[in-house]
């Protein structure tokens, strides 16, 4: 990054994750070769008093005027649906809402824009543990199944459609179990780990990776993500298998766990060091 001057970064979204990224960019950016050039939020008033007025972008369509090298989306999948392709006209894009890519039209538009404007689409792996190992096993043709279970307190969910009306009859309730593609539209902010898994395993993709959403009233201060995969059979007929469990501390009712904030910052740093090549890349 130091060889080419500061890497100009814009942040779209100013919720908990966006606030953390902006704070770090302002405090640590200069020594890391990063320059924050704008912050946009759907409600501009939320930035008052914490984001310098010169950095507040009022109109997302005008982001090109700030000449960003990288635009970081940490708002909502709708931003990727509505503006992702346009952002790629001006800069590389780091997607913080990978559930948006479950929509095949959106994925196609991003790929086409990426190729046309020669900009990369980076996807933050977020709370997905072992993403690189999943990718390697899949690339080798050995991944047979992949299942991601996300469990937290009901207050930590932001559900839509039929899932929003679902009731938890007991202390632990499975709200959804099935292909990740079917979950993302109704849990856009609670399915990003599963979406990242689908992108890490393109042979299975959004239709083959299984997502499970669990409401558990005992999980008042954490999000729990279980990743289970199976691989090729050995000489005895037993299959290769991995099961990881990630317990991520979280404030009551929070959508984003504390460790995910740190992981996202590392993804931001990583994609600023990767070559800008067209396509969709986990980082």
From Swiss-Prot:
Residues recorded as bearing Phosphoserine in the entry: 20, 168
Keyword Phosphoprotein: yes
InterPro entries: Asp/hSer_DH_NAD-bd (IPR005106), Asp_DH (IPR002811), L-Asp_DH (IPR011182), NAD(P)-bd_dom_sf (IPR036291)
Keyword Phosphoprotein in record: yes
GO MF annotation terms: aspartate dehydrogenase activity; NADP binding
Keywords in alphabetical order: Phosphoprotein
Pfam families documented for this protein: Asp_DH_C (PF01958), NAD_binding_3 (PF03447)
A biological-process GO annotation: NAD biosynthetic process
Family: Belongs to the L-aspartate dehydrogenase family.
Protein name: Aspartate dehydrogenase domain-containing protein
Source organism of this protein record: Homo sapiens (Human)
Gene, per the UniProt record: ASPDH
């Amino acid at each position: 990054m130091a060889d080419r001057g500061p890497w100009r970064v814009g942040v779209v979204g100013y919720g908990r994750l966006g606030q953390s990224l902006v704070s770090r960019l302002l405090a640590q950016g200069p020594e890391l070769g990063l320059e924050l050039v704008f912050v946009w939020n759907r409600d501009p008033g939320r930035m008052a008093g914490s984001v310098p007025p010169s950095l507040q972008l009022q109109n997302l369509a005008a982001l090109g005027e700030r000449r960003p090298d990288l635009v970081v989306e940490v708002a909502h999948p709708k931003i990727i649906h509505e503006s992702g392709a346009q952002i790629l006209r001006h800069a590389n894009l780091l997607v913080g809402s990978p559930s948006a890519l479950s929509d095949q039209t959106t994925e196609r538009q991003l790929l086409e824009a990426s190729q046309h404007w020669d900009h990369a689409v980076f996807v933050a792996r977020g709370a997905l543990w072992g993403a690189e190992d999943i990718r390697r096993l899949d690339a080798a043709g050995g991944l047979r199944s992949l299942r991601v279970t996300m469990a937290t307190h009901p207050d930590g969910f932001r559900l839509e459609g039929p899932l929003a009306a679902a009731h938890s009859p007991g202390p632990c309730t499975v709200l959804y179990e099935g292909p990740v593609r079917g979950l993302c539209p109704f849990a856009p902010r609670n399915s990003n780990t599963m979406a990242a898994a689908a992108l890490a395993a393109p042979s299975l993709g959004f239709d083959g990776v299984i997502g499970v959403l669990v409401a558990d009233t005992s999980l008042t201060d954490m999000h729990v993500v279980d990743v289970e995969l199976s691989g090729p059979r050995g000489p005895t007929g037993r299959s290769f298998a991995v099961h990881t469990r990630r317990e991520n501390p979280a404030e009551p009712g929070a959508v984003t766990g504390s460790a995910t904030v740190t992981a996202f910052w590392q993804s931001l740093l990583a994609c600023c060091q990767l070559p800008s090549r067209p396509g969709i890349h986990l980082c």
